[in-house]
Amino acid sequence: MFGAIAGGIASALAGGAMSKLFGGGQKAASGGIQGDVLATDNNTVGMGDAGIKSAIQGSNVPNPDEAAPSFVSGAMAKAGKGLLEGTLQAGTSAVSDKLLDLVGLGGKSAADKGKDTRDYLAAAFPELNAWERAGADASSAGMVDAGFENQKELTKMQLDNQKEIAEMQNETQKEIAGIQSATSRQNTKDQVYAQNEMLAYQQKESTARVASIMENTNLSKQQQVSEIMRQMLTQAQTAGQYFTNDQIKEMTRKVSAEVDLVHQQTQNQRYGSSHIGATAKDISNVVTDAASGVVDIFHGIDKAVADTWNNFWKDGKADGIGSNLSRK
């Protein structure tokens, strides 16, 4: 830097000196000092101080209180001013060019500038993708794409959850159905067992009552038949079974025939009381079978069999009423 300044000053001094010596390429004035006047090609000036100063300095007369600048100082001032202005201008341009070069914009084509910009952004923002580094639109596109991915994941999660819920509901329904089926079977089994127990108990009670009636010697045959029918009909009504008048008449006839048979066999045997107990069950069976709907209570016969017995009491045409009836 200092070498450049010194060189500039020397060059300016040399140029100024030559210009002063040779008149800047103009011929020297002819003439000289003649007496008390200074003669030139154009005019004649008096030799007084004022005339000389006016002729040399022109109309711009310097302040007499200030020292007149020498030739060397004036030349150096001009050279320094020019050097400073040139240096500042050159420095500013160099700094600008350097800054442009740093960002990749100094004296390059549009393609090179774009490539440099992309490289710069990629190095400055490595966490962004190319679309996001390109600008707001690209960033929006990236956000939209991310939104699509999120929506896909959300939809997949919802479908998976629905599938799991459906499977859980299906398994729960299976378990409930299994529990209900097992409970129903158990309830049916318990009901059947209870019904069988009730039937056995009622059959036993019926037989005991018939035997008690038959053993009562104070009752006439008609009274025995009436008592047997009364207790059997009461038992049937308790079970919700009702008979028509025709059915009751037919049942009474059969019970009467059985009572006659019991009395006859009792008279023919030595131990009649024991025979009464044995045959009381036969009478109970006759009444039970004849009671049609009551057969569900005593024997557990289904509805079809009960209907068959009901039809028997209506038309008197049924097969296999019982072995007891064959003895009437």
From Swiss-Prot:
GO terms for biological process: lipopolysaccharide-mediated virion attachment to host cell; symbiont entry into host cell. Keywords: Capsid protein, Host-virus interaction, Viral genome ejection through host cell envelope, Viral penetration into host cytoplasm, Virion, Virus entry into host cell. InterPro entries: Microvir_H. It is found in: Virion. One of its GO terms (cellular component) is viral capsid. It holds the Pfam family Microvir_H. Its main location: virion. Interacts with B, G and F pentamers to form 12S pre-assembly complex. Joining of twelve 12S complex form the procapsid. Belongs to the microviridae H protein family. Self-assembles within the capsid. Upon host cell recognition, probably forms a tube that serves to deliver DNA genome to the host cytoplasm. This tube protrudes only at the time of infection. This is Minor spike protein H.
